[in-house]
From Swiss-Prot:
Belongs to the glutamate--cysteine ligase type 2 family. YbdK subfamily. HAMAP family: Glu_cys_ligase_2 (MF_01609). It is an enzyme of class 6 (ligase). ATP-dependent carboxylate-amine ligase which exhibits weak glutamate--cysteine ligase activity. This is Putative glutamate--cysteine ligase 2-3.
Length: 365
């Protein structure tokens, strides 16, 4: 039996009108069609979104196959119902507001949070990695903080928004940060402190319940996992697998460091926020802040390469080191979702070209 932690992935997708590219409220019909094909799609806050979830996985090859199948079934279900499925952090074109999915909980969120909720047609990717306890998940979260902005830059896939270049590689992360319980995870000294903070947010009305604790790392409230949710939904299956594998190795590395009593990298909230902003703006082909060592600004690809080396023992234990190095090099050379969006947009400065690019990438092998 392997000592490696199991993992799983959730991906959120947009449903858009095939003719106009605008988000289209078809999630219930699409989910019903997918269910007939054996795939359970979850309804998200807005009715132009669906979410897939893999089974519990123990290797990246099976994860790749599962993600591809889920994306293709969801794509077919969308087309059956007159919609197009996009793996994108934001729609390249967007209406004034997104219709809220009509469930009691989502209606309550829409009523309490107003325009924040009604502009919430954004899509991320969440990776769950097995941990021994809830307390372990919180301690792992503390140790992942210096690396999250690098994963954000790597997976950026929301550059084009409202028919123009947003100026950010991931504008999704900027919009997401408006929620009072979103963004980089705070540092917690204990499980008790975590619980007290969550209780305070709920008492203040900043979250309905612990399901609305949207920090980019959190202990799952459903599974024995730590959940890393910093990413835009990646454009391709290959990029999602790369992201998930890095997260799995990072959790393993953090767990080992905790066991060995290694010091946690001290980070103030404003430094972490600055690194997030820099990574969100510049993306993979820009520069960001080295939070692990110098706090100097350096090329993002250099810091990502250093990150992979930091994870090398865990990646080698998983048998993934060479694969991850090769896949990272490929993404650096060919571009991630944000870079592909911009290349498509620059051809004619038409959002339709971006949508075509995203739709093809969504189901590419």
């Amino acid at each position: 039996m392997s000592n490696n932690p199991t993992f799983g992935v959730e991906e959120e997708f947009l449903l858009v009108d095939p003719r106009t590219g605008e988000p289209i409220a078809r999630n219930k019909a699409v989910a019903e069609t997918a269910a007939a094909k054996g795939v359970d799609l979850q309804l998200e806050l807005t009715s132009c979104q669906v979410e897939t979830a893999t089974e519990v996985m123990d290797n990246s090859d099976d994860l790749r196959k599962a993600l591809l199948r889920l994306r293709r079934v969801a794509t077919d279900a969308a087309e059956t119902n007159g919609a197009r499925l996009l793996a994108a952090g934001l729609p390249p074109t967007v209406p004034h507001k997104f219709p809220i999915t009509p469930t009691p909980r989502y209606r309550r969120i829409g009523h309490r949070f107003g325009m924040i909720a009604h502009e919430q047609g954004i899509c991320g990717c969440h990776v769950h990695v097995e941990v021994p306890s809830r307390d372990a998940a919180i301690r792992v979260s503390n140790r992942l903080r210096p690396w999250l902005h690098l994963l954000l830059a790597l997976t950026a896939n929301s550059a084009i928004y409202r028919g123009s270049d947003s100026g950010y590689a991931t504008f999704r992360s900027v919009l997401w940060a408006r929620w009072p319980s979103a963004g980089p995870p705070p540092f917690f000294d204990s499980e008790a402190q975590y619980d007290a903070t969550v209780a305070m947010l709920e008492d203040a009305g900043a979250a309905l319940d612990d399901g609305m604790i949207y920090w980019d790392v959190r202990p799952s409230n459903k599974f024995p996992t730590v959940e890393v949710r910093v990413s835009d939904v990646p454009a391709t299956v290959a990029e999602t697998v790369l992201f998930a594998t890095l997260v799995r190795a990072a959790v393993m590395t953090a767990t080992e460091a905790e066991k060995n009593g290694e010091p946690v990298v001290p980070l103030t909230d404003y430094v972490l926020k600055a690194a997030y902003w820099k990574s969100a703006r510049d993306g993979l082909d820009g520069r960001t802040i080295d939070l692990a060592e110098s706090h100097a600004v350096a090329p993002t690809v250099e810091l990502l390469t250093n990150f992979v080396e930091h994870l090398r023992p865990a990646l080698e234990q998983l048998g993934e080191y060479d694969t991850v190095r090769g896949e990272l090099a490929r993404v650096i050379e060919t571009g991630n979702g944000a870079m592909r969006q911009r290349r498509a947009f620059e051809r004619r400065r038409e959002a339709a070209d971006v949508i075509d690019e995203l739709a093809a990438a969504t189901i590419a092998e």
